[in-house]
Regions:
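Charged (often Lys/Glu-rich) extended helix/loop segments that serve as interaction or gating elements
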Residues: 137, 143, 152-231
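Glycine-rich anion-binding loop/nest that anchors nucleotide
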Residues: 80, 115, 229-231
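Nucleotide-activated donor-binding/catalytic signature segment of Leloir-type glycosyltransferases, i.e.
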Residues: 149
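Active-site-proximal beta-alpha core segment in soluble small-molecule metabolic enzymes
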Residues: 1-111, 120, 133, 141, ...
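Flexible glycine/acidic-rich beta-alpha junction loops that bind and position SAM and/or redox cofactors
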Residues: 39-40, 110-126, 156-167, 199-200
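Short glycine/threonine-rich loop-to-helix capping motif typified by GTGT followed
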Residues: 88-95, 122-133, 164-176
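Generic beta-structure capping elements
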Residues: 33-37, 117, 196, 230
Length: 231
């Protein structure tokens, strides 16, 4: 097959190159994912760039990536980065600039993928992040590359989460109530539902915010409660 493979480590690039030489199958053109040395996200747990992220070839090792590709007869025609989920426009702009600088090191460049990470605000009481600048940021960066190489460069982004993050609801049922007391006598009330982190892991894994609405008749007065799952 001629699948355009994106290699995220030097080892992956080496493995692909060995298989390509041995079998003669696959695409001679490949892409590499670059770790630009920094990341951004709404928390450290959604940060996929920088020294504490496993993702991507470290930006100082790009010459080694070129050597591996040359040794196996591969052409690095694409570069890619993705720094995390929920970064702001200033971070995305800076990383896009870095990727342009990295891309100039690959003379056969055809495709540059700026990744995703466009922020989405789950809290209905807060304004949605403005991403109107993003198009102009990318147009400017791609224009720099096209001027540098003297040809058209394909620009790719991964905006999917921004568009679908608010498109669904997880519906559950209250199955039990419980309460405990702290040492000072303060009462803690729990609502136990039939849905939990096995259905929506994001709050537990990332500390992410998701609004909760309790629907029903005769809910009683407002009070502080702790929402818990069945496990």
């Amino acid at each position: 097959n001629k699948i355009f493979t994106n290699c995220g480590t030097l080892g992956m690039l080496e493995e692909y190159g060995c298989a390509f030489e041995k079998t003669g199958r696959g695409s001679v053109k490949v892409s590499i994912r670059i770790n630009p040395g920094e990341g951004a996200g709404h928390s450290k747990k959604t940060n996929t760039g920088g020294p504490y992220s496993k993702h991507g070839i470290w930006y100082e090792n790009l010459s080694e990536a070129r050597n591996i590709a040359k040794r196996h007869g591969l052409i690095i025609s694409g570069v890619h980065t993705h720094i995390g989920s929920g970064g702001d426009m200033d971070h995305l702009k800076r990383i896009a600039g870095k990727l342009v600088d990295f891309a100039k090191q690959f003379s056969d460049l055809e495709v540059v993928n700026f990744g995703g990470g466009l922020p989405y605000q789950y809290d209905p009481n807060l304004p949605q992040d403005d991403i109107s600048r993003y198009k102009s940021i990318l147009n400017e960066r791609v224009g720099i590359l096209e001027q540098y190489f003297g040809r058209k460069i394909v620009c790719e982004i991964e905006p999917g989460r921004r568009f679908v993050a608010g498109c669904g609801y997880l519906v559950g049922e209250v199955r039990a109530l419980n309460h405990t007391f702290e040492e000072d006598g303060k009462r803690l009330d729990y609502v136990l539902g039939n849905i939990g982190f096995c259905h929506l892991i994001r709050p537990m894994a990332y500390g992410s915010f998701h609004p909760i609405w309790i629907v029903g008749d005769d809910l009683g007065p407002d009070q502080n409660i702790i929402i818990a799952g069945p496990v």
